[in-house]
Amino acid sequence: MLYGLKITDWDKICFVPSHNLKDGGEKTASTLKVGDKVLLKTSLGIDLAEVVSINSEESFSCETGSKQEAVILRKATKEDIRKDDYLNQKKKIKQAIKESARYVKELNLPMKIIDAHFSFDGGRVTIFFTAPERIDFRELVKALSSHFHKSIRLYQVGVRQVFELEGDIGPCGYPLCCRCFLRDFDKVSIKAAVEQNLAHRGMERLTGVCGRLKCCLLFEQNKKGNQNKDEN
């Protein structure tokens, strides 16, 4: 079996095979279910993670996540969950974002800090950010490491993913599709608009609140493509 695990909402799903459960793994595996919390050991350290899926290895898709050399140490206890909640309490996260943003401003980097997460083992802080392009943030890592006295992991989040998690109302007047039901975020090109005879509407009407081409362009294109296949 493959256990799909997420440490934070921003992280991609990490798939861990059942044989990567520590001592007593068979007993743990038989009791794990979606929604449970576990202690996960990776090359970065130890984190509290949530089981978001349980599937057979044959159903694994590299598009939804990645297999990692990680070990599920055990099912999390109430004390483990309380500890993680304490480490990542809103007040502490808000302060971490504020301090990180201050260093970003001092270094004049074109990036926006959107979230932070403290690892369960206390040795690492993950800083989540958005940016229009790739950035050399080596000086920022040094500054943050000195400030927090911990290892720093910087994680760039796509603009679409931000709106997927935070939600908003689309130009159509309905909640964003990415927030409600879309789970696969393939690249959307202007070709999708051309093939649906929508290119003449102009980029302003084809762009979503995230500033990218609307996901529904690709969704509708794929939907029509599947309908044509069924008719044939």
Give the ranges of each region predicted by the language model:
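Iron-sulfur (Fe-S) cluster-binding segments and ferredoxin-like electron-carrier domains
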Residues: 177-196, 202-207, 213-231
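Acidic-enriched and Gly/Ser
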Residues: 1-193, 198-200
